[in-house]
From Swiss-Prot:
It comes from the Bacteria. It comes from Paraburkholderia xenovorans (strain LB400). It holds the Pfam family ClpS. Belongs to the ClpS family. Involved in the modulation of the specificity of the ClpAP-mediated ATP-dependent protein degradation. This is ATP-dependent Clp protease adapter protein ClpS. GO terms for biological process: protein catabolic process; proteolysis. The gene is clpS. Binds to the N-terminal domain of the chaperone ClpA.
Amino acid sequence: MAIIPDKQDGTVLERQEKKLKPPSMYKVVLLNDDFTPMEFVVMIVQEYFNKDRETATQVMLKVHREGRGVCGVYTRDIASTKVEQVVTHARQAGHPLQCVMEEA
């Protein structure tokens, strides 16, 4: 907090400093389906989430076994962009892969 004297009438003003809070974070989650090939899911995780093959395979297996797998945690705008990119790529390739974002 800073104290600033007012030159007109001698009163003192206090400036409240804004406390910045970190941005909300969102998980990008792939959802399982019975049609998208496992290898396609691995490729998506590698390409859009910058994971190595082993990590991408682990995410794919989690999606396959548990119905969902977290690919990463990002700010809202980045998470939204990644969801859109993944869904668009999947549709262009003819796969029904679903990708969603959830508050972390």
